[in-house]
Amino acid sequence: MSKPRVFITREIPEVGIEMLEKEFEVEVWEDEREIPREILLEKVKDVDALVTMLSERIDREVFERAPRLRIVANYAVGYDNIDVEEATKRGIYVTNTPGVLTDATADLAFALLLATARHLVKGDKFTRSGEWKKRGVAWHPKWFLGYDVYGKTIGIIGFGRIGQAIAKRARGFDMRILYYSRTRKPEVEKELNAEFKPLDELLRESDFVVLAVPLNKETYHMINEERLKMMKRTAILINVARGKVIDTKALIKALKEGWIAGAGLDVYEEEPYYNEELFSLDNVVLTPHIGSATFGAREGMAKLVAENLIAFKRGEVPPTLVNREVLKVRKPGFQ
């Protein structure tokens, strides 16, 4: 009996590919750039499984071109790039990679927070460019004055795995921890000494606001002009969630006009992204969507992708199935 075919839309760590090759016929798109839409639509015609990145839109058009497709494994914790409702109707399983990238993303959130608060990027440029040497001044009491982090108030919007991991790091800085999520989490509140606050109250009280929510209809442009104006003028906004959670035009206005002190961004409304108006500001720290970019996290994601596909092939429910309603439509397996 021939092996089921899986197409992977980008090179993932070898550990995941090696696991899959034992059970599947594997094809990988090896170009650094994302796969062109027309090629993706051609590749899916005869595949049984698909491994996708956030950059690929997996929608009805893709499903219609893929009559054999039974499972889509997203190489990410988020899955807003996939039409999950349409997949479920067609009996197509959708999985993601939660858990394995939690700590890496939380680490980056704090890296952005510290870098923004303490002007690390500006200081690096000042030193590296030779400007420090040109000034001929070893130290000045008013250079690069930033904001204290220790003992301040952090407001975390979204209190799932990543939000809670950020809170754990905040405890090390003896911060007051506020959080907002759709549901209160009394046990976690007790464990992390965290306080639940309505969103607008959290924004008004926090020195640092960190976004860790999934993108959906409720969170799209959650941080808009009205809410940015609620924040302290000394507050710093960090986004490791999804770019579209923030209204970018409103954020630029806030940074320019001093409604808030600064921002640290890892995600953007469109990716890859360039915005001269935003990028010219010196009170924003920018990274190119690298929240999960550690060796350990990316290998863990690759393993979890493989584990999901292998479990499905064996007729088992994948460990991180997103659309559990699909179990009513089709049993797991390539039968």
Curated annotation (Swiss-Prot):
Residues that coordinate or bind NADP(+): 159-162, 181-183, 240-242, 289-291
EC number(s) per entry: 1.1.1.26
Subcellular location: Cytoplasm
Catalytic activity: glycolate + NAD(+) = glyoxylate + NADH + H(+)
Entry superkingdom: Archaea
PANTHER family according to UniProt: 2-HYDROXYACID DEHYDROGENASE-RELATED, GLYOXYLATE_HYDROXYPYRUVATE REDUCTASE B
Family matches, as SUPFAM superfamilies: Formate/glycerate dehydrogenase catalytic domain-like, NAD(P)-binding Rossmann-fold domains
Keywords: Cytoplasm, NAD, Oxidoreductase
Keyword Oxidoreductase: yes
Any one Gene Ontology cellular component term annotated for this protein: cytosol
Entry annotation: catalytic residues: 242, 271, 289 (proton donor)
HAMAP family: GyaR
EC class (word): oxidoreductase
Keyword Secreted: no
Assigned protein family: Belongs to the D-isomer specific 2-hydroxyacid dehydrogenase family. GyaR subfamily.
Subunit structure: Homodimer.
Protein name: Glyoxylate reductase
Pfam families: 2-Hacid_dh, 2-Hacid_dh_C
Gene Ontology molecular function, alphabetical: glyoxylate reductase (NADH) activity; glyoxylate reductase (NADPH) activity; hydroxypyruvate reductase [NAD(P)H] activity; NAD binding
